[in-house]
């Protein structure tokens, strides 16, 4: 579960290393976000000469959480870290051209098929 001020790893090659959630999108009183939800983030640390720089405010989709996600068959998939993929604000496509680490199948149901196709492993 991701809430405001949560620090996330960035799982793409857009140049950002860490991002902080500043708003959970989808309703005025919504507090928490899970895998597949879109959030508003600010870049906290970035590499030099990258597509994004520190302080940029972007949208991101959550791809991994420590809390995990429960499947219909009863299994729970948990990860070691909280991670997101930065999105282009206009067309909701990923900013980077590569995705690092595994992602879950639930992103397909949230219409992020491009992230699924770029990911090295889909659980």
Curated annotation (Swiss-Prot):
It comes from the Bacteria. This is Large ribosomal subunit protein uL14. One of its GO terms (biological process) is translation. Binds to 23S rRNA. Forms part of two intersubunit bridges in the 70S ribosome. GO terms for cellular component: cytosolic large ribosomal subunit. Belongs to the universal ribosomal protein uL14 family. Part of the 50S ribosomal subunit. Forms a cluster with proteins L3 and L19. In the 70S ribosome, L14 and L19 interact and together make contacts with the 16S rRNA in bridges B5 and B8. The gene is rplN. The keyword rRNA processing does not apply. GO terms for molecular function: large ribosomal subunit rRNA binding; structural constituent of ribosome. Keywords: Ribonucleoprotein, Ribosomal protein, RNA-binding, rRNA-binding. SMART domains: Ribosomal_L14.
């Amino acid at each position: 579960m991701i809430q405001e001020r949560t620090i996330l790893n960035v799982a793409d090659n857009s140049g950002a290393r860490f991002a902080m959630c500043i708003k959970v999108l989808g309703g005025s009183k919504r507090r928490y976000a899970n895998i597949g939800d879109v959030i508003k983030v600010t870049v906290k640390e970035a590499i030099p000469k990258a597509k994004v720089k520190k302080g940029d405010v972007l949208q991101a989709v959550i791809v991994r959480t420590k809390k995990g996600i429960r499947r219909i068959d009863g299994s729970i998939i948990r990860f070691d870290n909280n991670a997101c993929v930065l999105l282009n604000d206009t067309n909701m496509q990923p900013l980077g051209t590569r995705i690092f680490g595994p992602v879950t199948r639930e992103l397909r149901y949230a219409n992020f098929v491009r992230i699924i196709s770029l990911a090295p492993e889909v659980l």
